[in-house]
Amino acid sequence: MPSFIDTTKASIARVYDTALGGKDNYPADREVVERLRQVAPEIEQFTVDHRAFLVRVTRFLAGQAGIDQFLDCGSGLPTAENTHQAAQRLRPEARVVYIDNDPSVVAHGRALLEENDRTFFVPADLLEPRQVLDDPLVTRTLDFTRPLALLQLGTLHHYDESGGRSCADIMREYIDALPSGSYVALSHFLDPQDQDSALARRMEDVFLHSPLGSGTFRTREQILAMMPGLELVEPGLELCVNWWPDGPRLAPLLPAQRCLVGVVGRKP
C-alpha cells in the first residue's frame, strides 16, 4: 500500500480537491488550478459539474436501474457527496468498493469507510483491470453473477496510452468481466473539434506541463471507443452538465463546460 506522500508533486485527487474548494491539498496542487484558471477562469465550475454528474449518474443507477453494487475506480478524496452516500440514500443496502492508489487518497481512505459496513476501499491501480477485479476484497464484496455498476469518472484522461495499452483496451477488459445487465459510467475531457478546440488544447497544455503532468482531451470517437459492446443510455455521450440535468438551463454554458463529457452504457 502506498504510504509516502510527495507534496512537491501535484496529485490528481488533490488538484480536484483544490478546485472543489477542499483543504486536503498543497502548493503544487494549487499551482495547477491557478494555471488552469488563467486559460479557463471557470475551472471551478468545470469541476463542480463533474461532481454533479457523478451524483446524478449514481442516483439513476441506484434508482431506475436498480443497481445495488458499485465499483468506483479513482475514488478521489472524500468530499460532500460521495458515491456510497448518493447510492445508499436511494438503496440503503447498496455496497460500494472504491479503487485508488493515490497515496493521499489511501491515507484518507478510512474516512470513506466510517459511514457504514457496506463501503470498502482497495488501494489498487485502476489501469490494471485484473489487479482490481481479482482483489480479494472486490471478489468478496461484489457478486459478479449479478449486475453491478463500474464507474470510471475523470480517470482515463490522465492516462496517456504510452504504456502500450489503449484506454479502449483497458475498458474492454473491465467490461468483459461484468455480468449481463451491468452498467458502465465514464466521463472524460473532450476536444469538441469545433470553436472550443483551442480552449481544450490550452487546458491540455496546462495539465501536461504543470506539476500534475497529465490530462488529455480526446475526441468523441476516441471516448466512445472506451465503451465497447455497450448499449448507451439516452442521451448517449453528452456534456456532463447536460446529462439529465436537475432542471432547465437558466444561463448559457461557459466554454470549459463544453469540454467535459459523460456517458452511461448497459451491457446486454
Which sequence ranges carry the predicted segments?
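Conserved S-adenosyl-L-methionine
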Residues: 16, 231-244
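Core SAM-dependent methyltransferase catalytic element
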Residues: 243-268
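Short SAM/SAH-binding signature in class I
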Residues: 142-156
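Short alpha-helix
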Residues: 213-237
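Conserved beta-strand signature within the Rossmann-like core of class I S-adenosyl-L-methionine
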Residues: 148-152, 170-189
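A short, conserved alpha-helix within the catalytic core of class I
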Residues: 129-134, 158-173
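Conserved Class I S-adenosyl-L-methionine
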Residues: 198-221
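Rossmann-like AdoMet
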Residues: 1-124, 128-130, 137-142, 259
